[in-house]
């Protein structure tokens, strides 16, 4: 997972499937940082993700709750059709690409 903070948005680009080990990093390292730094906007780029397990879904929900605590927004972008089916119940806004995230949040 690669992180970049730009224009008030934390871009998280996953470079592999979101499984137990990635979920652990999200829950134990990333979410506390989101809360302590009061990060309000996150874009999750799913371009290189082929699969997500239950631990991954839970981690995304935990991240969504952290962002809501900060009165922010979270978006998924570049989501494959296969992943859209798995992610439909977590109710995170899906947009086509990172530029659309910037437009949605109003950063440009």
What are these regions (language model features)?
Residues 1-50, 62-108:
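STAS-like cytosolic regulatory interaction modules
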């Amino acid at each position: 997972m690669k992180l970049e903070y730009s224009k008030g948005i934390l871009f998280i680009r996953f470079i592999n499937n979101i499984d137990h080990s990635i979920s652990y990093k999200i829950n134990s390292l990333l979410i506390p940082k989101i809360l302590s730094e009061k990060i309000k906007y996150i874009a999750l780029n799913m371009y290189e993700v082929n699969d997500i397990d239950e631990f991954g879904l839970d981690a995304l929900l935990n991240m969504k709750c952290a962002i809501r605590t900060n009165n922010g927004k979270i978006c998924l972008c570049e989501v494959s059709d296969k992943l859209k089916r798995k992610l439909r119940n977590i109710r995170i806004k899906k947009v086509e690409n990172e530029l659309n995230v910037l437009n949605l949040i109003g950063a440009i």
